[in-house]
Amino acid sequence: MSGSRRLFLKELCVAMLAGRLGGKAFSSETKKIKLPIAFSTLGCPAWDWQKVLEFAHQHGFSAIELRGLEGNLDLPSHPVFAVGRIEQTKREIREKHLKIACVSSSANLYFSDKDKRAKELGDARRFIDLAASLGAPYVRVFGGKEQTDTSRFPDEQTKARVAAGLHELGNYAGPRGVAVIIESHDHFTASASLKDVLQAANSSHVGLLWDAHHPFAAANEEPEFTVKQLGSWIRHTHLKDSAGSGEDRKYVLTGQGNVPIRRQIESLRSIGYKGFYCFEWEKVWHPDLQDPEIAIADFARVVGECLGNRQACGG
């Protein structure tokens, strides 16, 4: 074969490859490397579905945690997730190269009243069905706490009810490819209470959503201790920063408070955590917080730097 023919074939192959890649094979535009970061839609209650997807895509997020949409916390009833719309919704998620990290319900499992308990478990099942339809791995539930209960820790009867609820929901979720995760929150913030409940639930379809802020801020636990106690159950995590202490503690932009976020991340890394590092900005509950356009983008920058540079995490 002559040299000119070889050159022609080489150029032809290059041209064909460039065409398959939409003409971008040799352009300066390269696909952004996405880190395992996510944000909860709790932080952007005014955004519509398209803005949620576009913002996540543009700021390098890999996933979204669904916790309400356009002010509607009852996600299964939102039109975006209706039977006739959900396939389009899934396509839109894929087109932005995103995943759904978790579908977060409001279900509380502490109730002793039979009717209230049945309602909470029923709501959790609806969210499990939605997660299964979306291909999401987890549904969040709460242990919860009576508003009139001033005790620091749940009693044995409450722990038993919560564990039984988790086990029941795990049995429902498992065959649907979903796991139920209890969040470190309310009465179930300290490692000891969570460990008791997770052990009693005794299900491979039950795990923990480690809201890393609450055990530190409310239970005075260092992240290394919490992860040592509960690491084998951690499936998903919430990260957020705050300043102050006790009742005076206020949420602030990531890195501007006194929550040891870098140590929390390193503690998860130390156990080979493979989940998402999810920003939960409680804009729904605290409307005076910074707007999500600022706070969520800031989280992507600060935690993205931490994940991309071990030295930035103190390790």
Residue map of PLM features:
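N-terminal export signals
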Residues: 1, 7-28
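Conserved beta-strand positions in the central sheet of alpha/beta enzyme cores
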Residues: 65, 102-104, 140, 238, ...
